[in-house]
């Protein structure tokens, strides 16, 4: 099993399935996770009103102890992340350090705000496509381009999470986790 650690950002309005499914699948694979709250609140109210207590507050200085950064979607959550300079700088820092940055649903709009999508091939929720003006958008459930891993929506969250496991650990670990969940995707 892996000894990798992943930081998953959450903010008010984050799509809860895209955060919680990722955390759950990564933990099943033995990959450590840390839910980092963006903003001041001790509890995050997600896009469907589910309240989640982050493990701590997003701190870009602490962020570099992680092997990957995940940006879930959700209109309100991604808006908060696009407006947070420390999130944008953290994304750039992860990439500069050669680390994986993953985003799902509207999450790639945060990557665009950080100025890192130019020349990249990626996907997002189709409703976010009009906002994404750089790079090459493709209509695929999960897309890998170098240090970027992107996915489309809550319905692709399991495939996205398993792709993270494969990238951070191995295809064999991803297969074992998928089998244990009876995932047939």
Which role does the model predict for each range below?
Residues 35-37, 101-105, 120-125:
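Short, hydrophobic beta-strand segments that form beta-sheet elements in well-ordered domains
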